[in-house]
Amino acid sequence: MNKVPLTEKGAQQLREELQELKTVVRPKVVTAIAEARAHGDLKENAEYHAAREEQGFVEGRIRDLEHQLAHAQIIDVSKLQKDGRVVFGVTVDLVNIETDEEASYQIVGDLEANIKENKISINSPIARALIGKREGDEIQVQAPSGIILYEIAAIGYQ
């Protein structure tokens, strides 16, 4: 199976969520199941069934996080070679050539992508157009509304 790229920061966030689920959430669910079981008949015990359902979700998320971390290629962005090219993990400041609108994106793996945090997947059309380019280069991105032209204003290696 191919390794999925993940920044060190993204891997740390997944580890923290996994730790929280294992040490805080899972024990609470087990306690809720035990309390509901003590109420008697399990066939008509809504609290018991709700707690069991929550347990299924928690265990599924734990398995999912463990799988993601086991199959991740963790990349420390601070140790990347700073040769002026756009690579995985960098933050790129763009200027729309037609509208002068500015945007800033960090190129991350699929697991970390979150447009609200300006993190775009390395597999997105914008990131694919940016990889290997340098500051001052122009790129074309195919958007639903047509082709958009951007200039790379800055590249940051945080």
From Swiss-Prot:
Keyword Plastid: no
Record-linked Pfam families: GreA_GreB, GreA_GreB_N
GO annotation terms (biological process): DNA-templated transcription elongation; regulation of DNA-templated transcription elongation
PANTHER family per UniProt: TRANSCRIPTION ELONGATION FACTOR GREA
Family: Belongs to the GreA/GreB family.
Role: Necessary for efficient RNA polymerase transcription elongation past template-encoded arresting sites. The arresting sites in DNA have the property of trapping a certain fraction of elongating RNA polymerases that pass through, resulting in locked ternary complexes. Cleavage of the nascent transcript by cleavage factors such as GreA or GreB allows the resumption of elongation from the new 3'terminus. GreA releases sequences of 2 to 3 nucleotides.
The protein, known as: Transcription elongation factor GreA
Species this protein is from: Nitrosococcus oceani (strain ATCC 19707 / BCRC 17464 / JCM 30415 / NCIMB 11848 / C-107)
Gene name for this UniProt entry: greA
